[in-house]
Amino acid sequence: MNGTKRLISALSGLIICFQSCSTAVSDCQEHFIGTNFWYGPILASDGPGSDHERLSAELDSLKSIGITNLRVLAGADGEDGIAVKVRPALQTAPGVYNEDILKGIARFLNELEKRDMKAVIYLNNAWEWSGGYGTYLEWAGAGKCPDTRRDGYGKYIDFVSQFPVNEKAKELYWNHLRFIVERFKDSKAIYSWQIANEPRCFSSERTNQDAFVDFIWRSAALIRSIDPVHPVSTGTEGRMGSELDMRLFERLAECPDIDYLNIHIWPLNWSWIHRESVEEDLPAAIRETDRYIDEHAALARRLRKKIVIEEFGYPRDGFEFRKGSPTSARDAYYSHIFERLTESAEKGGELLGCNFWGWGGLAAQNPDHIWWEPGDDYCGDPSQEEQGLNSVYMADSSTIALIREANAKLAATVCLEFPEPESWLMCGTDRRCVKVDFFCAEDCTVKAGAAFVSDTSLMGAADTISYICKEVELKAGESRRVEFEADLEPGFYEFRISVGERDGQMRHRREFNIGIEPEKIVSPLSAKEDFDAFWEQSLRELAEVPMDCRMTLVPEYSTSRRNVYEVEFKSLGGATMGGIYAEPVQPGKYPAIIEYMGYGAEPFHYWGDDNPETVQLLVSVRNQGIFLDEGHWILRGLDSKENFYYRGAYCDAVRAIDFICSREKVDCERIVSKGESQGGAFCWISAALDHRVKAIAPAVPFMSDFEDYGDIVYWPVHEVLEEADRLEIAHDRIFDLLSYFDIKNFTSRVGCPVLMAFGLQDPTCPPHTNFAGYNMVRGEKEWYCAPLCGHGMWQESEWVKLREEFLQKHLND
């Protein structure tokens, strides 16, 4: 196949539609500040704990401060009378229900509907305070669940870690799920269904984690099959509830039946703050909170899903429990969360809403004890926690005022969304326009300005190629799409959107990259007359260096199917290189995959049972990977092309092929390579300087188009030029040197099939530089674009899948 095939990430932009019965109501841009009100259905019931008058007063109070989204427990499971568990229970035995609580759920939803309020209903609990995991295991015959107050959380966690692998316990839960969802699915007050409160695996064992992921996926699919109208979420805390493993959280989030992500944030529980220094530890709490939000927002962005921070809490000053006691630190913490939400709404970010924990409202406190006892009012703190620990009461005047003001500000905010990010890369007959959705909860008219800035001017004057200003009239609660169109030449541009504020000032909201006809970008070659001779001589010198290979078995990663080794061997100039090598145990000839590492990337070991019929080499070039030293490799040897670090490193990329071909079990007709960033550059080199590689898959390749590179971003070109100034080397000499290592000067030599990936938002190896090399390839080639991705293409599961399919195809040809 000649020419180019284009592949653009096929994930659709996020649209969450909340529907009521047969009438669809799109609330995809309705951001909210809500609360946790776990005991609402109990107040609405007819039995013990009921208080209809208080329920009405609480809902009216919540509505008065702008809260319309309530996260609630469907009901507790198991026997009553356990101190750490809320009562009365909804499900007293498998499939046996307390009719009073069932009526309470119905009445609660009806009262919400009257007030145009919504409920997120969670159906299970990993923790002891409503039965959940522990009760289902008891009913399944797994033994008696430990009492956390008497036996401690260690024993409790050991016990409930059985839940993901106990088929009978899960089936009992699924029966409950079917019953509740079927019974209440037609309520107009349902915001979404939630699988559980803080579902956890409680195990680092792979078998347990796989079973846990399967449990979440099957639960979500079951809810969807019963109620295809309302959204579904997991209820998980995020990384902290996923055995500190972001990949485990991602596996849950990838479920197609999970509509939005949840995270919880607990500075005290997670030891970001301490009881004796609640106020003093506030800066640390905010810092860690921002990190936590950011890492999960990055995942949500990749998956095109929104996030709700559905639990967060902060103690009172001095670690008091009394309602009305000072809450200066809590108020500051809440304010920060609310600001993060509003800022995200303004910029079209990933945060959809937040629910603080929890609502104490009008509850009275018993002055004689701090733990809940029968007859006490319910508050935001369940029975296993000190009453007043995290509750927000109407008597907490400063907090109530803060919530009211934050909701008012959110309602007046003009929110943006940026649909169809696939359209940000425009080719052929595609219209040259960017779509923006505007939304406000109130009627308003705003000015919107859009600028298109050439990427090659970003480090200089930031030339605006086109500027468009429009007046946008918005009706309360309705979204309006506006298109900004410009006549643009082939290239990449930064799109900047500004919105007029109520004071008349235009304020910048967001910027992102777009692309126009990238295959028509022209970046002239910069190779010098002796370019070919230089590399021919370098390869001759490399061939004269004995490999002197050493292999050390790594038993902990080796299996009966494949052995894993750490290897080292010699390259140009006698420098040591090597990496991690895996080959099948059984005799035979096997295909080989060479994987080149990024700049300063940490090495990892292959696992023996993964790809057992394939040879793999993770390449560590000189002074990197398993031979890592102090870094700054691109600054080494700037005095001459012969001494420049990348002369040796490029030869190392070729020497890796020499090593692979020296192995008896390698089929030298079936070798492919892959890599990202610096590794992507080495991929190009492996095919340009050596023709034993049958296909390559470079992603976000480094080291290309240095002339334009420095006009787009600071690193690495400006750092190199600063070092040149220190060494008193003229800039033109530096660019002459770099031309011998510029990937675009190599790629016309590539004769094998190529699949290149790039992140449209890459701030490290900008897409302009990727295409400078790609466009010089004359043979079979195709590219893949991840429109929301920056430099981390390894996180793009769709790309990883396509890459592996591409490489396997050419290994099997």
Annotate the PLM regions.
Residues 27-272, 282-305, 315-329, 345-389, ...:
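Active-site mouth of glycoside hydrolases
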Residues 185-190, 635-677:
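Gly/Ser-rich "nucleophile elbow"/oxyanion-hole loop immediately N-terminal to the catalytic nucleophile
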Residues 355-358, 362-370, 771-813:
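C-terminal catalytic histidine-bearing segment of alpha/beta-hydrolase fold enzymes
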Residues 543-586:
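N-terminal cap/lid segment of alpha/beta-hydrolase-fold proteins
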Residues 581-583, 589-599:
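Short beta-strand element of the alpha/beta-hydrolase
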Residues 600-657, 707-717:
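Cap/lid segment of the alpha/beta-hydrolase catalytic domain
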Residues 680, 684-730, 785:
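Hydrolase active-site cap/lid region
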Residues 750, 756-758:
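Short beta-strand/loop motif that positions the catalytic acidic residue
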